[in-house]
Amino acid sequence: MKGKQGMCFLSLCLAVLLLACEGAEPALDASMARSNGESEEVTVDSLAIKAKQAILAYPALTDANCEEFLLTWAAEHPEHRFELTTSKGDMLLETFDDVPLHSANFHYKVARKYYAPSEFVRIVPDFVVQGGNSEDTRAQELRWLIGKHTLPAEFHSNRLHFRGALAMGRTYTGNPEKRSASYDFYLVVGRKVTRAELARLEREKGFTYTEAQKARYVREGGTPHLDFEHTVFGQLTDGFDALKALSIEPTDASDWPLRRQEFRLKVLSD
C-alpha cells in the first residue's frame, strides 16, 4: 500500500512539475461521480502555460482561506450572468447576490477555465442534470491546482429548488454542516409537486412555504425535498428546452451518460 501511495504521489508531483515548468427521493452526493473511461486528451503545452500563469496569480483554495478570497473576488467581479453551451443548445444562467460565496465560487471557477470544457456526469429524468466533477486528467489537475475545498451552506427561505434552480452538490457522509462541493453543480429538471407532498415536507423540515412558493411548485415543479439540504445560488433564465433534452439522454445504471455530454461555461457582461 505504501508503495502504491508513493507512486501516486510521485506521479502527481511530476504532473505539477511539468505544468509549472512548461507553462426516497434521490439524493445528490458529490462523491458519487466515477469515470466512464473516456478521458479527454490533454494538450500539455497550452494547458501547462495556463496552469503556470494561474499558479503564479492565485493561491490554492482551502476551507481555511476560501471565504476571504471569494468575497474579495466577488467585490472585484460583479458579473452574475453565464452562458452554458451544451450539445442540446445554449442556456443562460444567473447567480444570486444574496448567496455570495457560492456565486463567487462559480464565477471564479468559470474564470479559471475549469469548465472549458467539462462534462455532465449524472443525468436523472425529472430530477437533475449534474456536472463539473469530471475525472478527466485535465479536470483532476485543475482541481489540484485551483484547490480542493468546500463551501459553507448558504440557505435562504426564498432560494428553493424550483425547476431551473442552480445549486451545488455535496457529500452526505460526515458532513453535518451540509457544506457544498466547490466544483460539482446541478440544474433542477424536477417534476410537478402536489400540495400534499409540500405539507409533508413542511412537517419534516419544520419550514412553512409561502402560498406563492406552493403555487409555483405545483405549477412548475421542482425537487423540494432538496430544500435546505443543498445551497441554491442561481437559476436558469433561458434554455429550458435544452435542459429537458439533456435530461432524457440515455445513461448507465449509475446515471452516467452513455455518450459524453460535454459543456462549456463563460462569463457574460452584466
Regions found by a protein language model. Name each.
Residues 1-10:
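Bacterial N-terminal signal peptides that target proteins for export
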Residues 21-270:
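Cyclophilin-like peptidyl-prolyl cis-trans isomerases
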Residues 9-18:
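Bacterial N-terminal signal peptides
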